[in-house]
Amino acid sequence: MKKDTLFATRKEPVPAFDFNESVASVFSDMLERSVPMYRESITRQAELALDFYRSKTLIYDLGCSHGNFGMLAGKRFGDRPFSMVGVDSSPPMIEKYKQRLEQESFRDNIVLVCDRVENLCLGNASVVVVNLTLQFLSLDRRDTLISDIYTALVPGGILLLTEKVLAWDSSIAAVHLDYYSRFKRENGYSELEISQKREALENVLVPETLEVHQQRLARAGFDRMDVWLKWFNFASMIAVKPERPGK
């Protein structure tokens, strides 16, 4: 795994964060060192996908990057047939994913699409995964995507959503930021790397509160939802489409 040193030297000005070839080449290390409980989150998501997947439906991984969820899910499914569509707008990420799939027995079960997630026509899904993706969409497109996901899910289907979140109280938000910075320092990032990456992500990654996410899910039609994993300013959610309208 190539180490993330993208922000280790001073940059003036600091460029806006972009999912380019440089980021794609170190993304596994970046995720492990920047996203608390990342491995636990996607491991349990892969298990949930196995439990909720229905024959002859689709799993969508929207914002799939270089395929960590898909690789785990494929191994969890083993010999059980499944169909997955991975979508990402970054050509370098999709290319990395393709390379990883080449050696896997389940490579034909996963179709990769290089496009913006909001451009895709979704349908016949029993599982939709959206990991650290909604936060990069413009605010006016988020409601539409969640509504489209709800429509695409079969009754009883699930949405698995992980996001960086804001605390509604500014003093608690400050605590979250402090502990998140500590987490990154504990994982070997310098103060320069932390501050420059924060600047690079400003106005690129726009988080929301848990309450906003939950309200959006409810507006779309999800009547059952839960935060199943949370670490300060990161949260993983599950939302279930009713088996029957009004249930």
UniProtKB/Swiss-Prot annotation:
Q: Which residues bind S-adenosyl-L-methionine?
A: 38, 63-65, 131, 198
Catalyzed reactions: prephenate + S-adenosyl-L-methionine = carboxy-S-adenosyl-L-methionine + 3-phenylpyruvate + H2O
Q: Which EC numbers characterise this protein's activity in its record?
A: 2.1.3.-
Extract one GO BP annotation from the record: tRNA wobble uridine modification
Read off the InterPro entries from this record.
CmoA, Methyltransf_25, SAM-dependent_MTases_sf
Q: Which SUPFAM superfamilies does the record cross-reference, listed alphabetically?
A: S-adenosyl-L-methionine-dependent methyltransferases
Question: What UniProt keywords are attached to this protein's entry?
Answer: S-adenosyl-L-methionine, Transferase
CDD domains (alphabetical) = AdoMet_MTases
Alphabetized GO MF terms: carboxyl- or carbamoyltransferase activity; S-adenosyl-L-methionine binding
Describe the subunit structure.
Homodimer.
The record describes the protein's role as: Catalyzes the conversion of S-adenosyl-L-methionine (SAM) to carboxy-S-adenosyl-L-methionine (Cx-SAM).
The similarity annotation says: Belongs to the class I-like SAM-binding methyltransferase superfamily. Cx-SAM synthase family.
Q: What is this protein called?
A: Carboxy-S-adenosyl-L-methionine synthase
Originating organism: Desulforapulum autotrophicum (strain ATCC 43914 / DSM 3382 / VKM B-1955 / HRM2)
